[in-house]
């Protein structure tokens, strides 16, 4: 979508600093994971592929080609991407990933085509899509898109929402939602962005409630939640979406690092470092005895872009770090 205000991103980690999430897991009891509960590896990554019409100098095509080659991108069961806004760059990334992840959803909000159902407040006249897509190693039995009704600031101009997929993992159903929640930007009034996020998380909860998913099936919610794991809003997010916090959070301490990530530093030099990306289980459903979210401190070979006669060089593929989640 056209981003008339800058939005925050999130990232996820390499093995660098270990951060045990003493308040992350919350008080929710661990569900007993049955012997047939698949062990899932999930990657969420805000790829910062903004529209080249609005942001022509951020190396979208180069980064879209390089991301599928990275080690963190390989070996997952499911990949959830956010900010896959630019049509040609996101299509190229998905095409390059198709050998490893042959089962893919369209990008949320880009059109109604390719979905089994469209819910929420989808509009064909909204200037930008929602930027979320799900890539899977496993066959997709059903895929639905849902566009949030509530938004503020620049998010008002996009069809942001979530993708819902049902996967067939060796004969067992696994349910995954991929989302990008309301960004905090200058176009929102004080406290408004958090209020919009709360409504969006409640919309996810209501959507899943209506599915009446059996308790012995895993339900995962992944994405750029725009909620810092260390903030009071984190507990509210868990309650609103009916999620269980990760048992551990390892790797780099921030998925959105405005000091060490070269793109985030350039774009948001005055913003705080935050830990915004998450892959979490829904309460009351099968899940592993222990679930870990790991932020990967990604770095890449330097790449350079030119704007108004000035060269800028970066050593990251997005302004967020990727986050991997798995049992253990």
Over which residues does each language-model region extend?
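Extracellular/periplasmic catalytic domains that process cell-envelope and extracellular macromolecules
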Residues: 35-38, 72-74, 96-99, 124-128, ...
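Active-site beta-strand/loop signature of hydrolases that rely on acidic residues for catalysis
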Residues: 41-47, 67-93, 135, 165, ...
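Stable alpha-helical elements in mature extracytoplasmic
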Residues: 63-67, 89-93, 131, 144, ...
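Structured beta-strand-rich core segments of catalytic domains in phosphoester-bond hydrolases
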Residues: 84-182
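Active-site-proximal segments of metal-dependent phosphoesterases and phosphodiesterases across multiple
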Residues: 181-205, 226-238
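Metal-dependent phosphoester-hydrolase catalytic domains
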Residues: 210-220, 227-328
């Amino acid at each position: 979508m056209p981003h008339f205000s800058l939005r925050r991103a999130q990232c996820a980690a390499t093995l660098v600093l270990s951060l045990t999430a003493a308040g992350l897991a919350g008080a929710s009891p661990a569900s007993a994971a049955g012997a047939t509960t698949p062990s899932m590896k999930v990657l969420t990554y805000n790829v910062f592929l903004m529209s080249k019409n609005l942001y022509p100098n951020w190396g979208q095509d180069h980064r879209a080609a390089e991301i599928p080659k990275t080690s963190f991108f390989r070996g997952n069961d499911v990949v959830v991407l956010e900010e896959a806004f630019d049509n040609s760059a996101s299509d190229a990334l998905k095409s390059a990933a198709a050998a490893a992840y042959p089962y893919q959803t369209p990008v949320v909000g880009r059109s109604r085509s390719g979905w089994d159902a469209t819910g929420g407040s989808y509009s064909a006249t909204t200037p930008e899509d929602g930027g979320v897509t799900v890539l899977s190693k496993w066959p997709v039995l059903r895929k639905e898109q849902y566009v949030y009704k509530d938004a503020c600031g620049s998010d008002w101009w996009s069809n942001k929402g979530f993708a819902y997929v049902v996967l067939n993992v060796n004969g067992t159903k696994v349910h995954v939602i991929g989302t990008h929640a309301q960004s905090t930007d200058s176009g929102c009034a004080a406290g408004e962005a958090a209020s919009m996020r709360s409504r969006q998380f409640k919309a996810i909860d209501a959507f899943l409630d209506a599915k009446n998913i059996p308790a012995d099936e895993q339900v995962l919610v992944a994405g750029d939640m725009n909620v810092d794991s260390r903030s009071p809003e984190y507990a509210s997010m868990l309650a609103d979406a009916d999620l269980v916090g990760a048992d551990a959070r390892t790797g780099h301490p921030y998925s959105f690092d405005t000091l060490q990530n070269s793109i985030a530093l350039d774009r948001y030099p005055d913003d705080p470092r935050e830990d915004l990306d998450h892959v979490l289980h829904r309460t009351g459903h099968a899940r592993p005895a222990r679930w870990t979210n790991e932020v990967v401190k990604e770095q890449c070979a330097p790449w350079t872009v030119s704007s108004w006669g000035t060269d800028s060089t970066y050593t990251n593929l997005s302004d967020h770090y990727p986050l991997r989640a798995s049992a253990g």
